[in-house]
Amino acid sequence: GWVFYTAEQMAELNGALADGTDNADVKAALADDPSIFDMYAVSTDGLMVMNVVIQNLGLVSGAVVSPQEYAEIASAEVADTLTAYGYENVTAQTTAADFAGTESCPAVAVTAERDGTALYEQMIYLKTGNYVYCVTLCSFKEDVTAEMAKLFYAL
């Protein structure tokens, strides 16, 4: 089963991300980032997390940046970000994933390790107008991100 964050917990999460690191560069980037968590859920066993982040790219970037380009940018940046949060052996590869009835969505496959625990992430990118949506599916110990993606479907 899954436990979804309440509106109050989401507000806390959106305001407290920078508290999770001592890295000044990460804190500054988070302060300037117009991204917000729209959904956050944790599996009842604590071994899986999924979230949806929405970012307003603005009129200029929103018109020219594709989800594929956004995935490529994220792939280049995610290793540094996870390393700043204490992860080791971080790999990030631009790929594609089937998601919510759409085939081959731009995505980033991530693996990392922290305190002996493996982390697997699939970051899937979608875009509507000037907004990019990143659906992050994260599992610990074993990679079940493809199975997690199947939990989403088009309405």
Language model region names:
Residues 4, 66, 70, 74-78, ...:
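Stable alpha-helical elements in mature extracytoplasmic
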Residues 3-6, 41, 71, 86-88, ...:
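Compositionally biased, intrinsically disordered low-complexity regions enriched in proline and serine
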Residues 10-122:
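Conserved polar/disulfide-associated segments of primarily extracytoplasmic proteins
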Residues 122-130:
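A short, surface-exposed beta-strand/turn
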Residues 2, 129-155:
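Surface-exposed amphipathic alpha-helical segments
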Residues 1-13:
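Post-signal-peptide N-terminal segment of Sec-exported extracytoplasmic proteins
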